[in-house]
């Protein structure tokens, strides 16, 4: 039951917005402002998540666990939330990438989920501390551009630059903490980040993707046909980075251990797109483990804690059978 209650705190758990929360019309341009440095229990601001933020290397130096990362000729301050990292060296570190916090309604209006507004550095720190204790290894929450204290524009998600910023941040973190390998975990659009980083890096020993946006253009086409305003009028999906197109770039020496966890009844990221990714991995000679799970939210989407559990067990050296059993036991516990 405890895991089920924790799942309610995951950003994206609610697809509603507070009545007085800011919104952007389908064709309205965002109005970015100077990055706010959130500390302790200060709740993240929906305005910056919706409109974006900017800062300088000098200001970034004062951001707790902030990294100045440059990509495509522009820099952003990328914030991360570490737990249990040692000074001398860290053989294996678990890293989590969350999903989107900005949603669109049927008319294309953008808003920030109310669950995001309830989050703060303190709540993230508490979740990471618990994950580190469960795994017995250091962990990190990576704040994607424009959200959770990182500068940037969350409207520009899915693009290559977002991937490059996350890649550059991991490079700096690896060097700073003397990390040998990463176990990457990504939920929903965070799954796109993880799949994309596997295409770029050779230090990913394992990856866990839950309800993952891993076939980006396929899913974009699916949703474009279901909005009142065609998606192609709101964004150019051809510019999105689709990790499924470069699966052959995943390292084969060493070969990462890949887990994909899906709810076949998922209504946010269609199950068929995740199945397609798994089949493409197998066709390329990889051996992904595809686990079916049951999310308890109305959209049958929230499997982030299933993914964190699987990653913790991978870090402990558990077998595939043990991991599958633990994920299914979590399913059963949710309904007690």
Where in the sequence are the language-model features?
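The feature captures the conserved acid-bearing segment of alpha/beta-hydrolase catalytic domains
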Residues: 218-289
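Active-site nucleophile loop of the alpha/beta-hydrolase fold
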Residues: 208-218
């Amino acid at each position: 039951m405890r895991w089920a209650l924790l799942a309610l705190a995951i950003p994206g758990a609610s697809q509603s917005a507070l009545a007085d929360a800011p919104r952007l019309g389908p064709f309205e341009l965002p109005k970015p402002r100077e990055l706010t440095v959130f500390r302790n229990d200060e709740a993240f601001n929906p305005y910056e998540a919706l409109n974006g933020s900017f800062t300088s290397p000098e200001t970034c130096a004062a951001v707790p666990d902030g990294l100045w990362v440059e990509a495509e000729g522009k820099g952003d301050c990328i914030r991360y939330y570490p737990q249990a990292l040692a000074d001398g060296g860290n053989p294996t570190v678990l890293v989590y990438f969350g999903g989107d916090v900005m949603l669109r309604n049927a008319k294309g209006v953008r808003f920030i989920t109310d669950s995001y507004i309830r989050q703060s550095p303190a709540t993230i720190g508490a979740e990471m501390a618990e994950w580190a204790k469960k795994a017995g290894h250091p962990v990190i929450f990576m704040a994607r551009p424009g959200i959770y204290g990182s500068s940037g524009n969350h409207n520009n998600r899915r693009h290559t630059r977002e991937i490059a910023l996350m890649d550059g941040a991991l490079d700096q973190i690896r060097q700073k903490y003397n990390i040998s390998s990463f176990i990457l975990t990504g939920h929903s659009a965070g799954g796109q980040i993880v799949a994309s980083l596997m295409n770029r890096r050779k230090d990913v020993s394992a990856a866990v993707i839950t309800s993952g946006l891993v076939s980006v253009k396929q899913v974009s086409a699916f949703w474009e046909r279901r909005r009142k305003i065609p998606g192609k009028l709101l964004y150019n999906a051809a510019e999105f980075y689709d990790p499924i197109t470069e699966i052959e770039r995943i390292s084969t020496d060493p070969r990462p251990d890949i887990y994909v966890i899906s709810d076949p009844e998922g209504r946010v990221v269609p199950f068929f797109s995740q199945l397609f990714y798994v089949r493409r991995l197998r066709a390329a000679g990889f051996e992904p483990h595809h686990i079916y799970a049951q999310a308890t939210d109305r959209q049958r989407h929230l499997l982030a804690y299933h993914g964190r559990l699987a990653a913790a067990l991978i870090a402990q050296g558990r077998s595939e059978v043990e991991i599958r059993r633990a994920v299914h036991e979590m399913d059963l516990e949710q309904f007690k």
